[in-house]
Amino acid sequence: YILTGWYFVDSLAIMSIQPGTLILGDSASGGTLIVRRGAKILAAGTASQPIVFTSRKAAGQRRPGDWGGIIVLGSAPSNKPTTQQVEGGFGTIPNTAAMYGGTNPDDSSGVLQYVRIEFGGIAFSQDNEVNGLTFGAVGRKTVVDHIQVSFANDDDFEFFGGNVQAKYLIGWRSLDDCFDTDFGFSGKLQFVLEKRDPTIFDASASGSSNGFESDNEGSSPYAAQPRTSPRFSNMTIIGPAADSAAANALNAKWDFTSMLRRATELSIYNSALVGWKKGISLRDTLTQRAAIDGRLEIRNTSIAVPTTPLLTSTSPATGDIAGFNVTNWFNTPSFNNHGSTVRQATDIVPLTAFNLSNSFDPVPAAAGELATAGTSYTTGRLAGDTWFTAVSYRGAFDPSKPMSQQWTAGWSNFDPQTTDYANGVTAVSESKNELPLEFALDQNYPNPFNPTTTITYSIANAATVRLTVFNVLGQKVATLVDVKQGAGKHNVAFDASELTSGTYIYTLKVDGAQAARKMVLVK
């Protein structure tokens, strides 16, 4: 498929994209996919058949900004008016077409699973680029996991308000920040990888390139409610420099692993932040106050940078609030953080974490700090939250497994510049036998149907299976399976005699993973 111009999925409509689909973004028209408020996208790829959005150009000719990107707009809360138009250069279209925000934290914009987004971020005007993947007030019922954004010409992922929750994200060699959170975003992220390229950075006059950046809002006094307050856990954030020599050679635009400012309450847990010149910056008094009050937390986290690990707006140690010392705060014994003094990135991640190809391997040593320093999911702002998967290691990768058995296996691509897409999408894996547990959810048959149809799915190992049917409002109308089943193919009959005509979505959950498809009942 060729994506040309601004392609809007209209409110109440559903766009379905099948596993293995290849969508090429057109440069001349700035191909961009916008899922409007009230619409849904159902893009459920698999580890062996990811869905790929990429440049229309040939291998070797692709560049950041070759096309637009993906923008998903929802009805969850933000701290901006619901008439706000999303960032991205849409000044020439009707304002209502790109609005976002509402009052429903349980809003669903659909499903994004096993999706790659490559070479997006076309500039519609000076300093006005589309991000790789933009979420505008997207709600927590939206399913987001296994997403890779590569070579974005702005941010990889940007969250404007909303509370979407996502796991297994990759940001690869982007221009600006990997993650940018604004306007009251209060979602959750876990198992996140970022890797940066020393030759790709924001060289604009006002720009800088950070690991992630977070603001409550862009204008003083930064007091809008709800506050930007996401929780990030198990992040592996790898900058462009493996050691002091590489850091000293970086352009001055390379800044922080994490820039937290303008009253944000973003919190970081169980993570590894390495490879920049500088570490975490609590940029202003409002952000420092959030740290003092326990609304902004950094716990069980390791930093490895060669110059200044912790900063405020005035100096490396002393902040703008009398008596606040960011290093002392970070070193609070119960926080169990590491890295308040300078050290090399390779002290906690391997040198192969700085490879810029499919030989990239960030898996830490089995006896190293990230494996042994400790984690926690029961204290502070994580207390009582069962969404996070508790693991014993810091960062995104299990030190006991090789890269070929990590969650990135099969579907990710760390060298999209040279990938030949002439024959469509293929999985990137040295051995399919090394892939983790997979499952497949087939299209129901018949479809459309009246009143019965059959849903078929396959699981590779015995597992707990839940097969559920929802209407387009996200309301559950039937639970077809909720039991442990053996490996193999399973067929389930669905009788919709008691339902009205319309579109329904059936979801399959297997041990935490999920896929979804739509079906149409016509009476």
How should these model regions be labeled?
Residues I2-I14, S27-G38, G45, T54-D154, ...:
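Extracellular beta-rich repeat passengers
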Residues T4-Y7, L480-K484:
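Beta-strand-rich interaction surfaces with strong enrichment in secreted/lumenal proteins
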Residues S429-Y445, F449-F470, H490-A496, V510:
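Glycine-centered coil/turn sites that cap beta-strands in beta-rich domains
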Residues A462, V481-R517:
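Short, surface-exposed loop/turn motifs with a glycine/proline- and acidic-biased composition
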Residues M519-K523:
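Short beta-strand edge segments in extracellular beta-sheet folds
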